[in-house]
Amino acid sequence: MARRDAAGVRLITRHGNDFTARFPLAVEAVTRLPANSFLLDGEAIVTNERGLAVFDLIRHKRHGADAVLLAFDLIELDGEDLRRSPIEHRKRKLVKLVRGPHPGIVLNEHYEGDGAIVFIACKLGCEGIVSKRLGSLYRSGRSQHWLKIKNPAAPAVNREAEEDWGR
């Protein structure tokens, strides 16, 4: 999560850890966005030469300075609580906030369709996608309207499976 308010910018993990100092490029980008205050949902990523996120790299401190913020939802904007707004409304506001060249922050692309994009993401080597039902409201945690679909061939997914099964 990235929060900007009168106190400044903070990057907070889903477990409440403050990673602001770890990702200076993302902090600088969030500082430059055209709003007084906001809370956006996103993830710090490091990309490879093809522009794909490589989640193993983010675990290494030496890559923290290279990390960018992948923004995928907007929760608050200039005092307006958007959690009860449908995903389409939040995405439109997020696009307006993040559009333009902002090194250090990228907008997660939004696709509408029947799921074919999952197969494309898998072929590209992506870890997976999150499918959000049109009209869904913002909820923290898991939801029946938001599904994380993992690519079983992705290295990060295989590593998670090995850790879960103790291999």
Give the role of each language-model region.
Residues M1-R167:
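Catalytic cores of nucleic-acid ligases and guanylyltransferases
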